[in-house]
Amino acid sequence: MNLVSVKMLRSDDIDPARDSKHGATEFYIVYRHLLSLGKVFDTPLAAGPIRDVALTAGFDWNSKDNRFAPRKRVLVLGPTLRFKIAPPGFLDVSLLMAKEWNHCGLPPCKAPGNEDYIGFDAYPMLHAAWRVPFALGGVPVRFEGFFAHAFRRGEDYTGRPVGEEFLMRTALMADVGAAAGSTPNRFFMGVGYELWRNKFGNQDMPGVDTNTPTLHARWHF
């Protein structure tokens, strides 16, 4: 199974683009491939609440045009437990090893003895993704999202310890097409929430913690 997520995030003037009064723009791409070990070995691996065991591999790619100018590149690999939830729902919990490279465009990162582009120490990351379907007033609804907890990964561009990073995004999505009597599982709308702590491992500085309500619209091809 493959997952590809491409997001574009536009900030307001509180987080401006470099040398600009307008908000910065960020692109974030995630790719994950789940290889079912049950299918590879042709042996059912279900046990209790677990329906399968998989191997997850993938990458993250990020770019943002603010003063910090992050260019995050991450490779991940590790096992995933896939839990039993009625389709189209799922719950996958992974323990991944990750290797990250990133960039810092701030002046202190370019000072003698510091680095503006580094490879962090390899680190473990706990990751979970879910989709729980149910009906609300006769309308098909999905509670979906993910969280990722990245543990410490060495020092940053100026030699300071990198903090543990936590990111969670959730959304409550309604099947608008089905509610309108059209094709189900095609068009969804909903509301969500993002909680991010120590963004990119930075800590004890402005702008690294976010609490963001979100609006979502999604079309399934």
Residues of each region from the PLM?
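Transmembrane beta-strands of outer-membrane beta-barrel pores
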Residues: 3-14, 59-65, 97-105, 132, ...
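Outer-membrane beta-barrel architecture
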Residues: 30-36, 78-82, 127-133, 171-173, ...
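Transmembrane beta-barrel domains of Gram-negative outer membranes and organellar outer membranes
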Residues: 1-65, 78, 169
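Short helix-loop boundary/capping segments
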Residues: 96-162
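Residues that define the transmembrane beta-barrel architecture of outer-membrane proteins
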Residues: 21-29, 69-77, 118-126, 139, ...
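Predominantly the C-terminal beta-signal and adjacent terminal strand-loop region
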Residues: 162-163, 170-221
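Short loop/turn motifs that connect adjacent beta-strands in outer-membrane beta-barrel proteins
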Residues: 1-3, 35-55, 82-93, 133-143, ...
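Outer-membrane beta-barrel translocator domains and adjoining extracellular loop/strand segments
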Residues: 14-20, 66-71, 104-117, 154-161, ...
